[in-house]
């Protein structure tokens, strides 16, 4: 019988409003936008460091790591490269599926300031014809921002939908990363603000046990 996770929660105040983190000792379960307010900071300005609004004592290490990562993302994005990613323990990461494969590939391959089309991401995940399924995987992403589904846009340059917090939030995140939108997919090499080259490959991290 599978062990039931003892869930803990903490809340951050960010330029995008309040963000709730949920998880257990074994890993992060979710990142959720609590307020649908318009982002209160111009992405071209350096936002104030997010404030931790509260959470239970004895916050699990995965939530501590995720909090530090998000604080760096909003305030000093380059610092995220040197920070550990929290283990992930949402059920979607505990079973072998195309959705998990897509999410891991997105996390590992598409870095800050890069963008990828649904079709390109499908190819990276091993099925170039599965662009529609990639869209479904993005809607199933339990940890937006950390797994950057906001960097997945349409081949014609339109940003597409964003279940993480709506199109306004997606536009803010792309602008925060210096990603220009409205440009069709091209043979970019994955530099800041460019399309990711479809043939770029990398190994995937492992989910928590």
Curated annotation (Swiss-Prot):
It catalyses: a 6-O-methyl-2'-deoxyguanosine in DNA + L-cysteinyl-[protein] = S-methyl-L-cysteinyl-[protein] + a 2'-deoxyguanosine in DNA; a 4-O-methyl-thymidine in DNA + L-cysteinyl-[protein] = a thymidine in DNA + S-methyl-L-cysteinyl-[protein]. GO terms for molecular function: calcium ion binding; DNA binding; methylated-DNA-[protein]-cysteine S-methyltransferase activity; methyltransferase activity. Its main location: nucleus. Keywords: DNA damage, DNA repair, DNA-binding, Metal-binding, Methyltransferase, Nucleus, Phosphoprotein, Transferase, Zinc. Binds 1 zinc ion. The modification Phosphoserine is found at residue 14. The active site is at residue 149. Its cofactor is Zn(2+). GO terms for biological process: cellular response to ionizing radiation; cellular response to oxidative stress; DNA alkylation repair; DNA damage response; DNA repair; mammary gland epithelial cell differentiation; methylation; negative regulation of apoptotic process. Its EC number is 2.1.1.63. Zn(2+) binds at residues 5, 24, 29, 89. GO terms for cellular component: nucleoplasm. DNA binds at residues 99, 118-119, 127, 132, 155. InterPro entries: MethylDNA_cys_MeTrfase_AS, MethylDNA_cys_MeTrfase_DNA-bd, MethylDNA_cys_MeTrfase_DNAb, MethylG_MeTrfase_N, MGMT_N_sf, WH-like_DNA-bd_sf. It is found in: Nucleus. Involved in the cellular defense against the biological effects of O6-methylguanine (O6-MeG) and O4-methylthymine (O4-MeT) in DNA. Repairs the methylated nucleobase in DNA by stoichiometrically transferring the methyl group to a cysteine residue in the enzyme. This is a suicide reaction: the enzyme is irreversibly inactivated. This enzyme catalyzes only one turnover and therefore is not strictly catalytic. According to one definition, an enzyme is a biocatalyst that acts repeatedly and over many reaction cycles. Belongs to the MGMT family. This is Methylated-DNA--protein-cysteine methyltransferase.
């Amino acid at each position: 019988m599978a062990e039931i996770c003892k869930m803990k929660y903490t809340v951050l105040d960010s330029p995008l409003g309040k963000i709730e983190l949920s998880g257990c000792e074994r890993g992060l379960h979710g990142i959720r936008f609590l307020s649908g307010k318009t982002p209160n900071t111009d992405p071209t300005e350096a936002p104030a460091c997010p404030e931790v609004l509260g959470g239970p004592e004895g916050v699990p290490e995965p939530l501590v790591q995720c909090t530090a990562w998000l604080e760096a993302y909003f305030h000093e994005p380059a610092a995220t490269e040197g920070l550990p990613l929290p283990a992930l323990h949402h059920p979607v990461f505990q079973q072998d599926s195309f959705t998990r494969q897509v999410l891991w590939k997105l996390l590992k391959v598409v870095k800050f300031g890069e963008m990828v089309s649904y079709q390109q991401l499908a190819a990276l995940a091993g099925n170039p014809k599965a662009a529609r399924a990639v869209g479904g995987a993005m809607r199933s992403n339990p940890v937006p921002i950390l797994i950057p589904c906001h960097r997945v846009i349409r081949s014609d340059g339109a940003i597409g939908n964003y279940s993480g917090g709506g199109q306004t939030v997606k536009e803010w995140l792309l602008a925060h990363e210096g990603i220009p939108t409205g440009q069709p997919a091209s043979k970019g090499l994955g530099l800041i603000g460019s399309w990711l080259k479809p043939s770029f490959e990398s190994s995937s991290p492992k989910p928590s046990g």
